[in-house]
Amino acid sequence: MKLTITIMVVVVLIVFVIAGYVIIRYRRRPGDKSIPVQVEGNHKLEIIWTVIPIILLIIVGIPTVNSVFGLAKDYTKDPNAVQINVTAHQYWWEFEYPNLGVKTAQELLIPEGTIISVEAKTADVLHSFWIPSLAGKVDTNPGGNVNRMYFKADHTGVFLGKCAELCGPSHSLMDFKVKVVDKASFDRWVAAMKNPVALPEDQEIATVLNKQCLTCHAIGDKGVQLYPNLTGIGSRESVGGKLINTDQPEYANEGSVEENLKTWIKDPQAVKPGTLMPKVDLTDQQIDAIAKYLAGLKLDY
């Protein structure tokens, strides 16, 4: 892509410079009634401006053809690729690593320099999985259809992912993050996701968590995975894909992960209209305690 753009920019500059020079140098001057020298043709110039474009097309065409044929490769059985099952929900994303025994939500963590093999489907309506800075998009079609795509991140960083198909009132809020880390960090993250997680020491809060949260969500080896897995939620960039987690004072409109969890638990519909999570009947003290516990679920990788 960079090579192609560079070639195009160079060609455009050369053409415009020559065109500008010719227009100025050979313009009709006031009082000049003469007829310019008539040129029938110039074989040398014609050969030059025929051969040069051919060479440029070959330079651009070879990597293009290689890239196009590369798209036909199937990495679903490649032992060196990271296999990820992506499931789109209204209005969140589920990421399962079937070969690693890990399932998470809203943040896709991948190793740099490794082929990522994605199998995408939807749990409800039409969505589209899109990471603008890393890959193209692939639709998740209803009816049990599975679409595939492959990509590779060449450097570490955090990238924004989005749903690229109108899917309901909170379509614009259906964002997710992609974290690209080195291979060692990725391996530590996988191990951390599998570690057992202790419930709150306060038995009342532990009971509330079991009855109100773990009937839909999973935390470590506890609960069920019907809805977003909450393991390591304290380390995530956002809550609900919308509330950005930050403690930095310059971001006055955002909140800490604990504050954002309180906001979400109190009234999910106010944050993300149309979400399937209901407003749970909890006291402020219970919400505070659960938010504090969840905010403490951090992963060290």
Residue spans for each PLM region:
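The canonical Cys-X-X-Cys-His
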Residues: C163, L209-G220, L261, M277, ...
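Sequence/structural segment immediately N-terminal to covalent heme-attachment motifs in c-type
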Residues: A198-G223, Y227-L230
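Gly/Gly-Pro-rich "capping" loops immediately C-terminal to redox-active cysteine motifs
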Residues: K152, D175-D182, A218-N260
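Membrane-embedded segments
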Residues: V82, W92-E96, T104-D182
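Axial heme c-ligation environment in periplasmic c-type cytochrome domains
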Residues: H171-M174, Q225-L230, D247, W264-L297, ...
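Detector for the c-type heme attachment site
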Residues: A164-C167, C216-G223, S235, K266-P268, ...
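Electrostatic cytochrome c docking/interface patches
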Residues: G101-T104, K183-N210, Y301
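Extracytoplasmic entry segments of secretory-pathway proteins
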Residues: M1-E112, V197
